[in-house]
Amino acid sequence: QLVDERIVGNKPSNLSYGEAAAFRLTTLTAWELLFDRLQVSKDDDSKSILIIGAAGGVGSIMVQLAKQLTKLNIIGTASREETTSWLQDLGVYTVLNHKHKLSEELEKHNLPAPDYVVSLNGTEHHIDEIVKLIKPQGKFGFIDDPKSLDVMPFKSKAVSTHFEFMFTRSMFQTEDMIEQHHILNKVSDLIDNTIAF
């Protein structure tokens, strides 16, 4: 089967073919949300990101990309001891328990309002807390499919809202479709040199 070269990249040398095939979806989703949608700066060390559902596939990649390529203060959520340990091993500075109110968890850890909030699952469940805790003029991104999502409460804080769907470029043959090729090659180099999978 032929595949458009604009949506493929080099295989990381230290991954099997199966592992390399599996990392594409999570990697593109994490990268595009972090750098294309939220436009996270790679140089700003005064900002923080809260990643809800950080221990899953996309979250684990996003944490590592943020750790390797930005100076963000990375805050993640988990609820089990093993996922909390996993996130700490990946480099998350503070792990919040997403079974509790996230705004109260931030206060408990004396953390300021995050500039960026990413919801990888349970967005419908967490939306009220996200509205409450995000920094004014912050950026909110998500990947799941809530049945309904009222974003009007973000208006008073002028929070921008961003969807991420890694198939958008290929489905609509966007002008920047080649970016996925470049992203996958960059991440392949990172995996070979720094990121642990």
Question: Which ranges hold each PLM region?
Answer:
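Glycine-rich cofactor phosphate-binding loops and adjacent beta1-alpha1 units
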Residues: 41-44, 90, 94-162
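Mid-domain Rossmann-like dinucleotide-binding core that forms the NAD(H)/NADP(H) cofactor-binding site
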Residues: 21-100
